[in-house]
Amino acid sequence: MLDIKFVRAHPEVVLADLEKRQDAEKLLWVDTVLEQDKLFRELTVKNNELRARRNQIAKEINAYKKEGKDPAPLFAEAKALPGLIKDNDDIMEKATEQVRYYLMRLPNILHESVPYGKDDTENVVVKKVGTPRSLDFELKNHGELAAANGWADFERATKTSGAGFYFLKGNLALLDMALQRFALDTIIAKGYTPIIPPYMMNRKSYEEVTDLGDFEKVMYKIEDDDAYLIATAEHPMAAMYQDEIFEEKDLPLKMVGISPCFRREIGAHGLDSRGLFRVHQFTKIEQFIYCMPEKSWEMHEELLANAEEIFTKLGLPYRVVNICTGDIGTVAAKKYDMEAWMPRDNEYREVVSCSNCTAYQSVRLNIRVRDAHDFESKQWLHTLNSTAVATSRALRCILENYQTEDGKVEIPKVLRPYMNGLEYL
């Protein structure tokens, strides 16, 4: 969330940012935040004065008694003070709740390089890498191809779990694991620490990682425990150091998470009922960085470069897209998507999301870094995240881009060492 000190000092920046996001409702919230914050600070001063007066009255009563004066008026005043203080405390508590409610929902401040646009149709293509191959035969649907060859079973998964699930079998299961190992080896070699996070998070932690009001509809909730199955390893890695203070010498902290991801809501395009693109459960290798504020834009480009390296080595054509103001969401200050070429759809589709969240998550999670030259000085650190590979979508890319005319699927060369040298599925 935004730091109240920033909103207080720069309301014009917040308002201008909301204008760029075309969010009329939240524009009205800024005045409410400022009014309630002002009320809280005024009543804080007032209560400090009332408490000081209470202490002064005690001294005056003693003086009156010594001088033989009647202290009854002072007793009456002293008796009224606790009620006044409590009334102010109650108003302050409500003001604090209102300020936090809106701050938790106001979006991050966008970087100046985020393009203006109304929705995903106005995202800006930054570059394209690789050339989609020309085909003189009709590609088979990846789901039907996988099912026909015994590499996946969608029908039995629907019986056991419902639509949007799948069994991976045989060499396709091994290919999924090969993708995981290849991505992990690539990222670990760059100094990232591998992390297997908890696959569930409690509500409090989830509320502080993301806007749960928006995100909750896509998540699986465990009712009795007030917990959620994770939608991405980003979330537990972000919450891992909540309420802690880093030393500057320990940053950047670079991690790569390995986890299943669980999503209830599949998206505007609906379920991929016989396929691997939009599903309820998938494995994802996720990059995550905590860093000093002045390093975060450099780190953002590093995360993107890492993901690009993986898809380039896999030989999959892709493009990088700078997400526009109307499509970027609440948490990121800037976000790139990588979209891989899907021949059956004859279009690029999202396979990687790469975000710089600046201080937005660290403010929510109360994660700070101590100044190396001033022990008492602390500031919010920055957090960043990026997909390395989501295996279900990468599998679809391979099944389509490496499919041969006779229905075989060539295994990308970089994955063959993880497949005991196998060249075709």
Curated annotation (Swiss-Prot):
MF annotations from Gene Ontology: ATP binding; serine-tRNA ligase activity
Protein name: Serine--tRNA ligase
Source organism phylogeny: Archaea, Methanobacteriati, Methanobacteriota, Stenosarchaea group, Methanomicrobia
Binding site for ATP: 263-265, 279, 350-353
Species for this entry: Methanocorpusculum labreanum (strain ATCC 43576 / DSM 4855 / Z)
UniProt EC number: 6.1.1.11
Domain notes: Consists of two distinct domains, a catalytic core and a N-terminal extension that is involved in tRNA binding.
HAMAP family xrefs: Ser_tRNA_synth_type1 (MF_00176)
Disulfide bond residue pairs: none
Binding site for L-serine: 232-234, 286, 387
Family the UniProt entry places it in: Belongs to the class-II aminoacyl-tRNA synthetase family. Type-1 seryl-tRNA synthetase subfamily.
Cellular component per GO, a single term: cytoplasm
Catalyzed chemical reaction(s): tRNA(Ser) + L-serine + ATP = L-seryl-tRNA(Ser) + AMP + diphosphate + H(+); tRNA(Sec) + L-serine + ATP = L-seryl-tRNA(Sec) + AMP + diphosphate + H(+)
Pathway where it operates: Aminoacyl-tRNA biosynthesis; selenocysteinyl-tRNA(Sec) biosynthesis; L-seryl-tRNA(Sec) from L-serine and tRNA(Sec): step 1/1
CDD domains in alphabetical order: SerRS_core
Subcellular location: Cytoplasm
Location (main, coarse): cytoplasm
